[in-house]
């Protein structure tokens, strides 16, 4: 991912050697990295945290899913705020809330306070990604929307990869509580650069050049959308995308929440080795994000078809993950399971760049609201998936049965993808 970012920056040199759009993309990558570290760190500390606080698998699943209630709600609210008032202030506020909630997680004393900390974290992170999509829709050329979505989400998966060994190292020097405090303070690193680099309207940035402006989409002021959002009509267009994102999100929440415990409990690995195996699995996802963005844009340039570039790639990703998760259930060899999980994570993450590009394709002027509607499905999956997985695990004692849920939803998501129409732009109607 780092090599890809440097190549992109060199190809688009501007002031100080890096164009402003590249600087915006780099800061957004840093934001995705930090926010995913703060989101998934709880999975790595799960064995120690549950023992220390006396939590069952079901209680831990409830605490994890508590994040997703406000997260799902603020997909819609945050997307609207970014369309109406601009991403600059909205994203800075999100960052401050996330860092505060992460620090507070290190201070919890039981399941109640843990749930409260996760709820606050969900408020902060819920608006972040629709807001980032709104920012990308005005700061990135349309031909690079897939790449931009792929590379930013690749940064989030880099956070997934780094989190297990990073948390394990911090726990060796402090404790699981100290690791949350340290990460919360570290998370402030991207907020100041964001405020300094980003402007809601590229035309208002003093460092922007005429050449760079000509490469960007036709500008529309992000900090004061003159039209109210046509919620009902837009929601109808986005409903199939929301359903597909739910199916994808169910599986991702399994990877983010339960894979470290799967290696720790099912294969009896120690914390260090379960963290390393988990990082290897999530590394496959990081690669899939970048590859998905590059392939999606390449397909669009080659065919001119958004159906091919977005929908078909989503179907390939869903079916690939479906096949490799079946292999996970059918084998008990640690090495084969780890490889199949990595491949499943790779294919599931091929979905990310094209599906996050779809709201920008359908409704570029309402990209924040449209992507919020889409990722509402991901948030709902986050509410249900960790609890159902943990509950089935407690009820049956089998890891295979919860995995079957992901397998079925991946197949359903591939089928539902054929109802998406990224090639049909959303037609606006002016508010009276």
Model-derived segments and spans:
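Conserved MFS/SLC helix-loop-helix module at the cytosolic interface between two early adjacent transmembrane helices
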Residues: 73-112
């Amino acid at each position: 991912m780092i090599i890809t970012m440097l190549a992109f920056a060199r190809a688009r040199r501007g002031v100080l050697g890096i164009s402003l759009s590249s600087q915006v993309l780099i800061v957004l990558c840093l934001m995705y990295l930090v926010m995913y570290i703060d989101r998934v760190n709880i999975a790595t500390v799960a064995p120690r945290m549950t023992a220390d606080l006396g939590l069952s698998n079901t209680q831990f699943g409830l605490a994890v899913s508590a994040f997703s209630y406000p997260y799902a709600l603020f997909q819609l609210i945050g997307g609207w705020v970014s369309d109406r008032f601009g991403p600059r202030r909205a994203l800075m506020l999100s960052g401050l809330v996330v860092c505060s909630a992460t620090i507070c997680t290190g201070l919890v004393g039981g399941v109640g306070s843990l749930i409260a900390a996760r709820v606050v974290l969900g408020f902060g992170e819920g608006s972040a990604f629709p807001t980032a999509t709104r920012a990308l829709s005005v700061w990135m050329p349309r031909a690079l929307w897939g790449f931009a979505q792929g590379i930013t989400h690749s940064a989030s998966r880099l956070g997934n990869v780094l989190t297990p060994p990073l948390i394990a190292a911090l726990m060796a020097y402090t404790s699981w509580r100290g690791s949350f405090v340290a990460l919360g303070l570290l998370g402030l690193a991207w907020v100041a650069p964001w405020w300094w680099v980003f402007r809601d309207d590229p035309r208002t940035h003093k460092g922007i050049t005429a050449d760079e402006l000509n490469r960007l989409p036709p500008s529309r002021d992000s900090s004061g959308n003159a039209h109210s959002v046509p919620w009902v009509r837009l929601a109808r267009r986005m409903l199939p995308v929301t359903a597909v994102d739910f199916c994808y999100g169910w599986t991702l929440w399994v990877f983010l929440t339960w894979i470290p415990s799967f290696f720790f409990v099912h294969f009896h690995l120690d914390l260090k080795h379960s963290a390393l195996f988990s990082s290897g699995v999530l590394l496959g996802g990081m690669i899939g994000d970048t590859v998905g963005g590059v392939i999606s844009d390449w397909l669009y340039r080659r065919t001119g078809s958004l159906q091919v570039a977005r929908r078909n790639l989503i179907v390939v990703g869903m079916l690939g993950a479906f096949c490799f998760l079946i292999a996970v259930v059918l084998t008990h060899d640690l090495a084969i399971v780890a490889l199949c999980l990595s491949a499943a994570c790779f294919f599931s993450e091929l979905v990310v760049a094209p599906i996050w590009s779809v709201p920008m394709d359908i409704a570029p002027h309402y990209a924040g609201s449209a992507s919020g509607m889409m990722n509402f499905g991901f948030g709902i999956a986050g509410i249900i998936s960790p609890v159902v997985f943990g509950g089935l695990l407690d009820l049956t004692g089998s890891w295979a049965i919860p995995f079957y849920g992901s397998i079925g939803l991946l197949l359903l998501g591939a089928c539902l993808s054929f109802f998406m129409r990224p090639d049909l732009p959303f037609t606006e109607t002016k508010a009276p």
